[in-house]
Amino acid sequence: MKKIQLNSIASSCSLSGQRLDLVLSKLFREYSRSYLKKLIIMNQVLVNESIVNQPDKKILGGETLTIHPFSKDLLVDIPENIFLDIVYEDSDILIINKPAGLVVHPGSGNKSGTILNALLYHYKNSKDLPRAGIVHRLDKDTSGLMVIAKNIFSYNHLLLLLKEKKIIREYEGIVHGKMIAGGTINKPIMRHYNRRTCMMVHHLGKPSVTHYKVLSRFKFHTHIAIRLETGRTHQIRVHMLHIKYPLVGDPCYSGFKIQSNYRKDKKTNKIYKFPRQALHANHLSLHHPIKKNVMSWTVPLPQDIQELLLKI
């Protein structure tokens, strides 16, 4: 991409505590907030000469903010004919079953081949909606249910339901270790200091609550059900590591001490090398934006996790 120019400006202390994308829209008024948000996501914004790719990062005030603008037509998301596994659809919402390996929306390293690109292809009106109607995300290698808005009324309604914690999102996962019982994890989460693609539990983070219960126990593993009360980035994965029961196959959050006899067992050693986090969003429940009735959807575990359960 050809850069147009380089712009730097010092932020005022009066902007302390405000979101980065909002601050940029106030300082660089020639650009829209949505355009600036895309620049942030694409690693084209520096805060004190360090790349920041979080639009919601809070500004302290006094930092030097630098943007690398691109021609706006180069930032347009392209419609792509990507298959969507549709579980339910009406004129207001779409429920899909996302496979592992599919990214939700374009970002650094994933400029195309995402659910957003697929929505732009299959639903022409989605181009007029924020993020093509996407109101929540699943990690690339987490499979399962997502709700997507098909009009602006539904989009705003679903965002409100999420804010009020009125969308029930339940998961199944397989963790390392033999759990005794279920419980609730109430620990704040923030971005990791050094590993910028990972998150961590920290007292300065955002409030995060995860409920879990045991479905079945095995020699070295536990099959669990999880319900989110909040929806932070990597929340389940971070919380499971925090209580020392990390998800099988998690590339970012499996750094823990394994029982001495664990890797000596050939079967469990293969399980340790499962190619993605063993996590699936199996259940979704919400009040329909227009019909107002409660609707629920449940999908089975994907084949790879079903086979994993047979191995443990």
From Swiss-Prot:
Major location category of this protein: cytoplasm
Keywords: Cytoplasm, Isomerase, RNA-binding, rRNA processing
InterPro entries listed in its UniProt record: PsdUridine_synth_cat_dom_sf (IPR020103), PsdUridine_synth_RluA-like_CS (IPR006224), PsdUridine_synth_RluC/D (IPR006225), PsdUridine_synth_RsuA/RluA (IPR006145), RluA_PseudoU_synthase (IPR050188), S4_RNA-bd (IPR002942), S4_RNA-bd_sf (IPR036986)
Example of a GO MF term: 23S rRNA pseudouridine(1911/1915/1917) synthase activity
Domain (S4 RNA-binding): residue spans on this chain: 18-87
Reactions this protein catalyses: uridine(1911/1915/1917) in 23S rRNA = pseudouridine(1911/1915/1917) in 23S rRNA
Entry EC number(s): 5.4.99.23
GO cellular component: cytoplasm
One biological process term in Gene Ontology: enzyme-directed rRNA pseudouridine synthesis
Key word rRNA processing present: yes
Subcellular location: Cytoplasm
Active-site residues annotated for this sequence: 139
Origin superkingdom: Bacteria
Enzyme class: isomerase
Protein role: Responsible for synthesis of pseudouridine from uracil at positions 1911, 1915 and 1917 in 23S ribosomal RNA.
UniProt-listed NCBIfam families: PRK11180.1, rluA_subfam
Protein family according to the UniProt entry: Belongs to the pseudouridine synthase RluA family.
Name of the protein this chain belongs to: Ribosomal large subunit pseudouridine synthase D
Organism of provenance: Buchnera aphidicola subsp. Acyrthosiphon pisum (strain APS) (Acyrthosiphon pisum symbiotic bacterium)
